[in-house]
């Protein structure tokens, strides 16, 4: 597993073509969503694009509006091969967030309906896959396949958090998606820690200690 760097702006198929020359087709892009939040799972997605049906406007999910992400999600799932992996809070707390993320990426690649010849991974670490993998820092802004994976992972996780918010009102997960915002912090202080909070994360540990002192 090796790393790749590139200064080119905007996602394209350059890195996919490089890997195709080395390993053949198809190439999967893999990305994750939700490493930093205090609550909820980390979600990874793997995408093999159909280069004859590329959705217009693919980009890093963080640069797109929610409405645009939803529209692209529908286009990607309608034209590409997609796999999703979800590491729950129990796995995050047991293994740590990095290992849980790598496991989710492995699950996402394994869930693809077509086996990739190689994979591009967003970031600087590669999971252990059944195919060659290369890490690409800022891959979601450089590779169309990774950008597509970032959209699938982000939309999937946002939908999960919206559902969890219905069962656990008061933490504003429908807005903050489990990230450490002021309204989430207020919810922790007022309502306590839920089963969906990551107890290995320091802000959640602090809330547990504070709640114990208050009892």
Label each residue range with its predicted role.
Residues 1-215:
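RNase H-like, Mg2+-dependent phosphodiesterase core
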